[in-house]
Amino acid sequence: MAVNGISRYIRLWNHVANPAEYILRKGERHHRDLHFTTKPLPVHFRVSAALYQVFKELFMADVYEIDALVNTLPADPVVIDIGANAGFFDIQLLSKVDRATIYAYEPMPANVETLRHTLQQNPRLQQSVRLFEMAVTGQPLDWLDLFAEAEENDQVVASRFAGFNENNTQTITVPCVTLTDIIWTHDLRSVDLLKMDCEGSEYDIIYHTAPELLRRISRMVIEVHDMDKGRNNIGAFDAYVRSLGYTTTHAPINSFCHALEAVRR
């Protein structure tokens, strides 16, 4: 569950070695990138103004409760990251565990460029993160139209739904892969963690992946967005995931988005 108030600064102190970069220099973010180093294992990465809120969600609000999450994983976990964004979740994870095998999927060019730069700056991460510039779907598609902000440098969050965000006025077309194909192509007989933050696509992905493949996943952490009153809302989604044999918990992030954690029974 996301933290707030002074607790955010405690989490920041726990996760980065140079919290003063945020505390003293966050006002400079519109003029230069902020630069951070994680702890206990050092990962060097940059945060642009466009990524500022994403950074705060993970390293301050700590929406994935990363320390508690890591304690549930094996020493060398296999992870699928759908909606990797600029890789902040992968950075956070690899600041806590020395090794992992992460299949990271991100369709937005600006995010991919940022994550590639981070990988180049941190050779250890190159051994763990396999980056794919693709969107993930449930039903097979070769290409998918995503709606994003007009300015290329601000295109850090996009959705397949035109009305998801009123600022998403530009369409970009990206290549796709299904979760089914990810599991089969990489011969993933077991997956320790599926992390998913894909702005409404979570329904297509989970509802259209065979239950026997989903059950290969031990744990899931998913941002679930309320899209309608039918099947595309937290109540229906939670019930479906539980029907697959998972124990679930969820908590609101904001008025239309929820953090759901599912553990296979």
Feature locations, PLM:
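Phosphate/nucleotide-binding beta-alpha loop and adjacent structural elements of enzyme active sites
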Residues: 1-265
